[in-house]
UniProtKB/Swiss-Prot annotation:
Keywords: FAD, Flavoprotein, NADP, Oxidoreductase
HAMAP family, per the entry: FENR2
Sequence positions that bind FAD: 12, 31, 39, 43, 83, 118, 285, 326
Catalysed transformations (reactions): 2 reduced [2Fe-2S]-[ferredoxin] + NADP(+) + H(+) = 2 oxidized [2Fe-2S]-[ferredoxin] + NADPH
InterPro entries, sorted: FAD/NAD-bd_sf, FAD/NAD-binding_dom, Fd--NADP_Rdtase_type_2, Ferredoxin-NADP_redctase_2
Cofactor binding, per record: Binds 1 FAD per subunit.
Gene Ontology MF: a single term: NADP binding
Subunit structure: Homodimer.
Protein name as it appears in the record: Ferredoxin--NADP reductase
UniProt cross-references to Pfam families, sorted A to Z: Pyr_redox_2
């Protein structure tokens, strides 16, 4: 039996993993995705400004460090596993069951599943799956791949406009199509992309995709006006789909441990990450309380709070907080290496 099972491998879950290790707890970390990082993997090239004391840098750099930190104390990690139930058998005895039927036991549970299981909405046209490993994209991993390319973006929200704005600086051309009369993204961003000569095509959708000779790459896109039905084919090097996300939070609605909920998607909790069930803590975007802010920085704070409370739940006579890291014995040898690197 582990001390704590953390469900969710985003920033809050990863920091909870680190801090629980700092508090000398054994940790199990479970995530439904094939990689750790949560929603941060959706926008790897975005520049993150709002983490205190961290200089602005691309999200993928912050994510790399966050994962490294979360794994510092060598938690037991399970990827590609969807949790379907949390059962409180008794005080300090929980069972976490996965879709595959695996049952993991621990003394406490931390729920850090963000907005739930997030998957980009797929383009609904015939044969789309054959292009997903080549030049059809649902997530922009690197802007550099679009250098000097003709790029089509389908979607009129903030994410689509953000991608259009950044890609237009290096691409040969960027075209944005969306079904409505106007984009739903911020008006200021619409002005910015227009200034970069991004072509905006309202009331337009992708009718179907035309592949190359071996059907491995998209060579043309047939666009359709949603009102007139008129179509025309345009050659593009890459196609990006930004139609929003499908979210799944069935764990919270179907779990045996009936937590008080704020709405269908979020746990009703408190600033210290406690929930209506002792021994279960919620941190990051999944928890709601009056003082909640949805920032990566606050996700880190939530993770530390959840780990501290799990520690005192498991061991009531434990200190409410851990030692500050600069004085912690566990980092003594690592600190020597860091000091030598920076001073000599």
């Amino acid at each position: 039996m582990k001390d704590v099972t953390i469900i969710g491998g985003g920033p809050s879950g990863l920091y909870a993993s680190f801090y629980a290790g700092l508090r000398d707890m054994s940790v199990r970390l479970i995530d439904v995705q094939s990689e750790l990082g949560g929603k941060m993997r959706i926008y790897p090239e975005k520049i993150i400004w709002d983490i205190g004391g961290i200089a602005p840098k691309p999200c993928h750099e912050i994510l790399k460090d966050t994962i490294k930190q979360g794994l510092y104390f060598k938690p037991e990690v399970h990827l590609n596993e969807r949790v379907v139930d949390i059962r409180k058998k008794s005080e300090r005895h929980f069972e976490v069951e996965t879709e595959a039927g695996e049952i993991y036991t621990s003394k406490a549970v931390i729920i850090a599943i963000g907005a739930g299981i997030i998957n980009p909405k797929q383009l609904d046209v015939k044969g789309v799956e054959r292009y997903q490993l080549t030049n059809l994209h649902y997530v922009v991993q690197s802007y550099r791949r679009f250098k000097d390319k003709d790029v089509l973006i389908s979607g009129g929200g903030n994410t689509a406009l953000d991608w259009a704005h950044d890609i237009a600086k290096i691409a040969k051309s960027v075209t944005v199509v969306y079904r409505k009369e106007d984009v739903s993204g911020h008006e200021a961003m619409k002005t910015l992309v227009t200034d970069l000569n991004v072509k905006l095509c309202p009331k337009t959708r992708i009718k179907y995709l035309v592949g190359n000779d071996d059907e491995t790459h998209i060579s043309e896109v047939v666009l359709e006006h949603v009102e007139s039905g008129d179509t025309h084919a345009v050659k593009f090097d890459d196609v990006i789909i930004s139609h929003g996300f499908d979210r799944c939070n069935t764990l919270l609605s179907e779990t045996s441990s009936k937590l008080d909920m704020h709405d269908d998607c979020r746990v009703k909790g408190f600033g210290n990450t406690t929930t209506s069930i002792p021994g279960i803590y919620a941190c990051g975007d999944i928890v709601y309380h009056d003082a909640k802010s949805h920032l990566i920085a606050s996700a880190f704070s939530d993770g530390a709070n959840a780990a501290n409370l799990a520690k005192t739940y498991i061991q009531p006579d434990a200190n409410a907080e851990g030692y500050v890291s600069s004085h912690h014995e566990v980092f003594k040898e690592a600190n020597k290496t860091i000091v030598n690197k920076h001073l000599y």
